[in-house]
């Protein structure tokens, strides 16, 4: 007994033996395939009739909702033929109403919604490999749960052939063997590869990655509508949802357009008012083949089965991409024609990012570029692409389309707030670790102790001014230096940043918990703190040309990383919005009287006189700042030499960044207010619409009641006209328009009615009072019944006095 929906029976007597054997052979079907072949869209949805189906918009229901969505079950009869053709469409079928004059017995294919009769036919269902990937649930990202194409070899099924097709195949093969295997077993995979091979033979450039990235789905298909048999493997688009804007002509980000994509569903690109000028993706094809995303993820089919049916049209990587090296040496960064090198994104004057090769003569020093970018508050990730973008493989970094400018494909101005506070700490740490690996430590001769200080100095050099990590690590270094004895450290340049400078983000907008977690990830061993404190145990005479800060030596040109709070000499108060990292905070809490004599001598003062300044520094050093010559926001540094201009420039850029952030905040507030106002208007409009609907329903009910009443009155009027009762006479001016027979009939009717009236008048006169004509007559003393009792009291009998009676009657 066959498990498939098409029962196999005895073939026609004229069929060849081989074809008869294949028809008689049962086609086993998997349970999932059997369910779809037998029941998909063949019955009406019972929930939709009750208006309870939740899969109507978008329409993903297993059953049909409207008649034009109904699918006839495909059956192979006992004679080996199908109940309707899998290829020839019916010309009488109405796609709007879903009706055909032949009904279900029509031998041709009906073009239902989604072309379900052909896709789910025994001949084609799950016989071809789908070129789209699957999501986390195993469903097709393009066609959803009910995809009619196979996702993997385990989902393939062999097609069921019509006996006439089998006879034609056998006649074509002329008795060759192994026909069944080539038809039944290899048809699905071979058909997919054959279609791609045909396309590649027509246009060999489709094998080039750059050509696919620049031209795939950018031109309309040259074949007539509904005649393209290449399916989704066709490199040309067939509708607006399949179209991809050419990256040569249009610049757009890899993010989906909010006007087109809602949730997981891609809508009509025509809903976007900006059209092709929109800076976001409009279709899934545009997003997958965007230069920032293209080939950035491994292909699932290649990982699972080792082959991909999409071939060169696959948007995912088929070859294992080598990871970027941790140590980017100049020799490895040289670009070659075969394999372009990685691209660094330099900020240009226009605010965009320009790709520059590390080996280019215009490429700046990595550490200088990193420090510059970090000081602006927007750290650039040297280990990959800029923040917020997906890292591309090395072989796609340098792709530039013909006729394009030098701008990188993803070089767009970032939207306000693209760097959230919870990402700043992690980006700083990542940049620091990259810088620690990239920075050569053997560029100049150093003393034995100098490399121990360098990691923390480098950390301060790559962090932006006033950032949470800058103030925290600066306070950490200062606390460590203040709590240890002097050491013979040689003169070195400490690129410490100003801790009193305002942070790039306002204090109220900084998420302290995120910075705390970022600081917890810091490996203090990378800074050489243990070796640094060990080195400080060796006490020697300090260098005469340096400044003594709590037992350490700093060059006079370097800023002092201490906040401007000069009132306290026993503790360190950080101006950073995040909690400072203090390595030796317990030393700062010790009273000044516990300092040893050697320390007092080294500091050049006596603890008993209370002349020690902040953190044990000689108070004479702070005389320049205690006089109030500097504002509270000015850092306690020596503003002289070439560093003053650089500091002024950094402050100016910081002010510009702060003003830009304020403008973004104002714009965001205005947009939020406008959105709130629109939302309120929409709610009010909805309420008014509901009220109008209720009023309309009430008016409709009143109208129906009035119509019923009018109908009743019309029926009553017709009944009166048809009965024997007297009718209202028409206008006298209309009598001449009536026919003579009508006038005779009217005259006869009126005479009959007049006789009835006379009889009624005579009867009423015989029983009513002759005087008042209202009360009934009563018997008078004269035995006459002419007057009522009331009239008889004041009047005499009119019968006894005829003259009186005549007067009464007159």
Curated annotation (Swiss-Prot):
The lineage of its organism: Eukaryota, Metazoa, Chordata, Craniata, Vertebrata. It comes from the Eukaryota. A zinc finger (C3H1-type) spans 84-113, 124-154, 215-241, 251-285, 293-321. A zinc finger (RING-type) spans 766-801. It is found in: Cytoplasm. Sequence-specific RNA-binding protein which plays an important role in the establishment and maintenance of the early morphology of cortical neurons during embryonic development. Acts as a translation repressor and controls a translationally regulated cell morphology program to ensure proper structuring of the nervous system. Translational control depends on recognition of its binding element within target mRNAs which consists of a mandatory UAG trimer upstream of a U/A-rich motif. Associated with polysomes. Residues 643-723 form a coiled coil. It comes from Homo sapiens (Human). This is RING finger protein unkempt homolog.
């Amino acid at each position: 007994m066959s498990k498939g929906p098409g029962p196999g029976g005895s073939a026609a007597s004229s069929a060849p033996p081989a074809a008869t054997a294949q028809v008689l052979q049962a086609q086993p079907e998997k349970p999932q395939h059997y369910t779809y072949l037998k029941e998909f869209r063949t019955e009406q949805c019972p929930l939709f009739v009750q208006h309870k189906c939740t899969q109507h918009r978008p329409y993903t229901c297993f059953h049909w909702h409207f008649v034009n969505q109904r699918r006839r079950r495909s059956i192979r009869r006992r004679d080996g033929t199908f109940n309707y053709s899998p290829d020839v469409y019916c010309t009488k079928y109405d796609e709007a109403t879903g009706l055909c004059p032949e009904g279900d017995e029509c031998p041709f294919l009906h073009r239902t919604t989604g072309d379900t009769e052909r896709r789910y036919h025994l001949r084609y269902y799950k016989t071809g490999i789908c070129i789209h990937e699957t999501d986390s649930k195993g469903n097709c990202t393009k066609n959803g749960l009910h995809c009619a194409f196979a996702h993997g070899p385990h989902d393939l099924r062999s097609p069921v052939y019509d006996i006439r097709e089998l006879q034609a195949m056998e006649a074509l093969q002329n008795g060759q063997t192994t026909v069944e295997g080539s038809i039944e077993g290899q048809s699905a995979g071979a058909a997919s590869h054959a279609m791609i091979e045909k396309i590649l033979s027509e246009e060999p450039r489709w094998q080039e990655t750059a050509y696919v990235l620049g031209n795939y789905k950018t031109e309309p298909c040259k074949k007539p509508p509904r005649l393209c048999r290449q399916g989704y493997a066709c490199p040309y688009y067939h509708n607006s949802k399949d179209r991809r804007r050419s990256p040569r002509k249009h610049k757009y980000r890899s993010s989906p357009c909010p006007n087109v994509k809602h949730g997981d569903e891609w809508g009509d690109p025509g809903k976007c008012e900006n059209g092709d000028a929109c800076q976001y993706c409009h279709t899934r094809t545009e997003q997958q083949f965007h230069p920032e995303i293209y080939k950035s993820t491994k292909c699932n089919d290649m990982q699972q089965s080792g082959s991909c049916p999409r071939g060169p049209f696959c948007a995912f990587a088929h070859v294992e991409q080598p990871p970027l090296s941790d140590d980017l040496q100049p020799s490895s960064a040289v670009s070659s024609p075969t394999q372009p090198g990685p691209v660094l994104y330099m900020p240009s004057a226009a605010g965009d990012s320009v790709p520059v090769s590390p080996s280019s003569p215009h490429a700046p020093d990595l550490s200088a570029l990193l420090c510059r970018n970090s000081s602006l508050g927007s750290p650039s990730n040297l280990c990959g692409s800029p923040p917020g973008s997906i890292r591309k493989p090395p072989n796609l970094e340098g792709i530039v389309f013909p006729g394009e400018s030098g701008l990188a494909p993803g070089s767009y101005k970032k939207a306000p707030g693209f760097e959230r506070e919870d990402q700043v700490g992690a980006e700083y740490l990542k940049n620091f670790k990259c810088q620690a690996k990239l920075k050569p430590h053997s560029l100049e001769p150093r003393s034995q102790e100098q490399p121990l200080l360098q990691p923390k100095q480098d950390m301060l050099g790559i962090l932006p001014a006033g950032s949470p990590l800058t103030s925290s690590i600066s306070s950490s270094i200062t606390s460590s230096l203040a709590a240890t004895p002097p050491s013979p450290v040689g003169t070195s340049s400490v690129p410490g940043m100003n801790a009193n400078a305002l942070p790039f983000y306002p204090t109220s907008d900084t998420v302290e918990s995120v910075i705390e977690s970022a600081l917890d990830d810091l490996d203090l061993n990378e800074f050489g703190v243990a070796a640094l404190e060990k080195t400080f145990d060796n006490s020697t005479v300090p260098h005469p040309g340096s400044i003594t800060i709590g037992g350490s030596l700093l060059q006079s040109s370097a800023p002092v990383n201490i906040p401007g709070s000069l009132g306290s000499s026993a503790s360190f108060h950080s101006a950073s919005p995040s909690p400072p990292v203090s390595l030796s905070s317990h030393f700062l809490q010790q009273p000044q009287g516990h300092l040893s004599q050697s320390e007092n001598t080294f500091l050049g003062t006596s603890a008993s006189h209370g002349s020690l300044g902040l953190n044990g520094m000689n108070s004479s050093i702070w005389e320049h700042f205690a006089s109030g010559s500097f504002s509270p926001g000015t850092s306690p540094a020596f503003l002289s030499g070439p560093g003053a201009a650089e500091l002024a420039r950094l402050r100016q850029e910081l002010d510009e960044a702060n003003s830009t952030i304020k403008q973004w905040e104002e714009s965001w507030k205005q947009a939020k207010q406008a959105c709130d106002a629109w939302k309120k208007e929409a709610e009010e409009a909805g309420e008014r619409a509901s009220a109008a609907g209720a009023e309309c329903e009430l008016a409709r009910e009143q109208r129906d009641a009035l119509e019923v009443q009018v109908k009743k009155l019309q029926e009553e009027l017709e009944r009166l006209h048809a009965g024997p009762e007297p009718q209202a006479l028409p206008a006298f001016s209309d009598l001449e328009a009536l026919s003579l027979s009508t006038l005779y009939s009217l005259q006869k009717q009126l005479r009959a009615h007049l006789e009835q009236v006379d009889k009624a008048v005579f009867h009423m006169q015989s029983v009513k009072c002759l005087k008042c004509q209202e009360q009934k007559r009563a018997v008078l003393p004269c035995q006459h019944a002419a007057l009522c009792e009331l009239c008889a009291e004041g009047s005499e009998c009119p019968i006894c006095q005829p003259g009186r009676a005549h007067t009464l009657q007159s």
